[in-house]
C-alpha cells in the first residue's frame, strides 16, 4: 500500500456486489424460481413471441416423433433414459434447464439418426452424452463423467468415448442446443402472469413437467403447448387462465386444449410411482455395471449404425494384437475394465 500510485486509498472493506438480473437462484431442489427483474408486460409478450418463433426453428415435436420412437421400439428405452436424467439431476443438484435440455438433445439426435436396431447400451451412451453436453452449456461447474455414471446405469463408458460422442451429437444437431423447452417456456409464461414469487406453484409446475417429458405421447405437442397446458391444469383462477389463452392464436389454443385433455387422461400417479420405484432401486456396484465402451476415429454422423459398428472393429483389432484366440461375439461389444483407467 506504500507504493500506490496517485495517492489512491484502499476501501476499508470490499463492497458487496449487487445481484445480477436473471441469474438462477438454485441452491436446493425446493427453489426453482429465477430472480427476474421487473419487466413490463410488453417486454414479456415480446419474449413469448420470440420463444414461439424460435420453437418453430427446431421442429422437435410432432406425431412423426412419436411414430418414430414406437417403430424403433424405443418407448421403454426412452422412458428409462429420462428417468435416469431426472434422478441424476436430483443427485448432483443440477439445474432444471440442464435436464430438459438433455432430454431435448436426446430426442432430436435419436430421431435424425439411421439405426436399424437400438440396444440398451446405445441408448445409455446417448443419454450420458446428452446430459454431459447440456451440463456444459448450463452449469457453472460441470460434473465429471464418473459422477454422472455413478448410479442408475447398466453400462459405463470411457471418457474418450463420451468426448467423441459429444462431437458426433453436436455436429448432428449443428451445435444448436439452446432449444426452447417446456421448462424454459414455463418460466417465461409464469413471469408474464405474475407467478414468479409463488414457490409452491412453481415447484408443482416443474414436477409436473418432469413427469410429462417421460411420456412419449406428449412429444407430439410443441414445448410451449406442453408448458401452457401444465400451468393451466395447476391453476384454478379463471382470470389467469383467460390471460394465458389470450397470448396465443387460435391454432395454438386448440393444441393447448387438446394437450390439457391428454394430461388429464394420463395416469400421473402410475407414472410417479414408476419413477419413485426406479429411484429406490439398489445401485449396482462397479463390478456389476456392465461394459466399458471405447471409441476412436471419425464417423459419419448420418448413420448411427456405422458409428456403433466401430466398437466391434476396435475389439477385434485389440484381440488380434494380443494374440487371443477367443474373440467374443460381435453383438456383445465387451471391452475390458482396464481400459477405463
From Swiss-Prot:
An individual GO BP term: embryo development ending in seed dormancy
SMART domains, per the entry: CYCLIN (SM00385)
Alphabetized Pfam families for the sequence: Cyclin_C, Cyclin_N
Record flagged with keyword Cell cycle: yes
Gene3D superfamilies reported for this sequence: Cyclin-like (1.10.472.10)
Similarity field: Belongs to the cyclin family. Cyclin D subfamily.
Protein name as catalogued: Putative cyclin-D7-1
Species, as recorded: Arabidopsis thaliana
Source species taxonomy: Eukaryota, Viridiplantae, Streptophyta, Embryophyta, Tracheophyta
